[in-house]
A protein has these predicted regions:
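Active-site HxH/HxHxD metal-binding segment of metal-dependent hydrolases
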Residues: 1-31
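Active-site neighborhood of phospho(di)ester-bond hydrolases with catalytic His/Asp-centered motifs
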Residues: 3-7, 62-67, 85-90, 113-117, ...
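Loop/helix-junction capping segments adjacent to catalytic residues or to phosphate/diphosphate-binding pockets
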Residues: 72, 94-96, 121-123
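Binuclear metal-ion centers of metallo-dependent hydrolases, dominated by the metallo-beta-lactamase
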Residues: 17, 23-28, 76, 100-145
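Core dinuclear metal-dependent hydrolase active-site scaffold
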Residues: 23-80, 93, 139-145
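Active-site-proximal segments of metal-dependent phosphoesterases and phosphodiesterases across multiple
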Residues: 47, 84-106
Length: 145
């Protein structure tokens, strides 16, 4: 089992032991696993070591922002074209709100955006996420890109 985690989380998850590959995955770390590459990018969160991840596989780049606020400094870490971005929209707990998330997704140049972190601590309707090519996830339904 592969476990990628920034330093503070890495220190904790290693305590679980087991036959796992625990990789310290701090900002701007690149890690390849077979034909898949993982690249960590800055996230703006209360946890200063928080990161997002760009996963590259089968010729596509998927950017999972993780918990983050909109911060222009993040864009300096995005060093490849983004096919799909997964972005929080709930505006709670240092996550972007729906408006900022749409602006952020557009600025990355992503072809498709998937709003996440809605319906947790809020009553946000993800259909209000202003992005031309968006995919609204449904519970227990696979998304194919």
């Amino acid at each position: 089992c592969l476990v990628l985690a920034p330093k503070n989380a890495w220190d904790e998850v290693r305590k679980f032991g087991g036959d796992h590959n625990y990789v310290m995955f701090n900002r701007r770390t690149l890690f390849s696993y077979g034909d898949i590459t993982f690249y960590s990018v800055r996230a703006q969160h209360s946890d200063l070591e928080a990161v997002g991840v760009i996963i590259s596989a089968e010729g596509k780049n998927y950017y999972i922002t993780g918990d983050t606020l909109y911060n222009d400094e993040i864009f300096a870490d995005i060093n490849r074209d983004i096919d799909v971005i997964f972005v929080p929209i709930n505006g709670v707990g240092n996550n972007m709100n729906i408006k900022d998330a749409a602006l952020f997704a557009k600025k990355t140049g992503a072809k498709t955006a998937v709003p996440v972190h809605w319906g947790m601590f809020d009553s946000i309707d993800p259909n209000g996420f202003d992005f031309e090519n968006k995919v609204i996830p449904e519970v227990y339904k696979e998304i194919v890109f």
